[in-house]
Amino acid sequence: MADFTEQTLRQKLTNLSNHPSSIQTTSAWLLQNHSNRELIIRVWLKTVKKETHGSKIVNLLYVANDVSQNARKTCPQFKDEFFPAIESSFRHAIELKNAKEVEHAIGKLINVWKDRQIFTPSQCKRLHEVHQQVKLSGSFPTPAVANKEHGKVAQPSQFVVEEAKKNAQDVLLSLKRLQNPPSTEREIRTELSKYPDNISCPEKLQSVRSSQEAQSLLVQNEEALPMLEEYVKRLKNETNERETLESNLNMLIENVRMSIEHHEKLCREVKRREDRIKADLLEVEKTFESLPDLAAEMPNAPLPTLEALFEKRKK
C-alpha cells in the first residue's frame, strides 16, 4: 500500500467510488495508518463538508462505517474518536438539497451500528435525532443556499451556531453532574469493604466447613447485593456520562475550529476590502490634485447673472 501522507489521504478520499473494493481498500489503508487517526478524521470531515453531491458523501460515510467496525479489534480508540466527526457529517447532510440518497444511507448505517453495538445506545440515539432532522430538511431551504442564490457571501448557518451553543451547555451540564461522581464516594466503598472476601470470591467458598458458616455467608451476601448492584449501576451511569462528555468536548473543539476558520476568512475579506477602499481613495486624491484651479486661472471673472443664464438657454 501507498505510504501515508496528507496529500495521499486527500487523493484517496477524493477518488473514492461506490465499488465495494474501493471502500474496503481505502478502509484497510486507513486502519493500517491508525497512528495518524487524528489527521485522518480531520481530513475526512473536511472532505465531507466540502462535498455537495450525495453519492460522494455516501461513499465517505461507508468508509467511516468500515473503519469503525473493523477498528473494534485492532484500534478501538479509532472508532471512538471517529464518532464526533460522523455526527458532524450527519449534521452537514441537513444543509443539502435533495439528499434522499444520503438520508437513506444514514438510516441504514444507524441500524447497523445499533444492531452490532458499534456505538453506544446513547450515541446511536443522538445519531437518530440528527437523522430525523435530515428527513425534515428537504422541505426547508438553508440560509447558506439562499444567500448564494442572491449573489451574497454565504454566512455560517444558524444551525452550526446553535449546535456550538448546545455543545457548550452539554459540556457544562456533564461537568456539573460529574462534580461528585460515584467513583469518588469513600463511604460506599468503605461499607462494602467490611464484608468478607468470600461473598465476592467463589474460590474462597471452599473454606466454608459448616452449614452455620454457609448460612451466615448467605445472609451477608443478600445484605450486600442490593447495595453493590445500586453502586455498580451508578458507576455505569458515570461511565456513560464521561463518554458523552468526551464526545461533546470533541464536537465543541470541532465547532470552535470551524468558527476560527470562518472568522479568519472574514478578517481576510475585510482586510481585502479595506485595501481596495484605500487604493480607491488614493486614486481619487490623485485625480482631485490633477484638476485645474479655476479660481487661480480666472480670479477677476464675474459670475453670470441668473437672467443671463436664462437668456442664453432661450437662444
Curated annotation (Swiss-Prot):
InterPro entries given in the database record: CID_dom (IPR006569), ENTH_VHS (IPR008942), RPRD1A/B_C (IPR032337)
Keywords: Coiled coil
BP-aspect Gene Ontology terms: mRNA 3'-end processing
GO MF: RNA polymerase II complex binding
Domain CID, residue spans: 1-135
Residues in coiled coil: 227-273
Source species, domain of life: Eukaryota
One protein family per Pfam: CID
Protein name: CID domain-containing protein 1
Organism lineage: Eukaryota, Metazoa, Ecdysozoa, Nematoda, Chromadorea
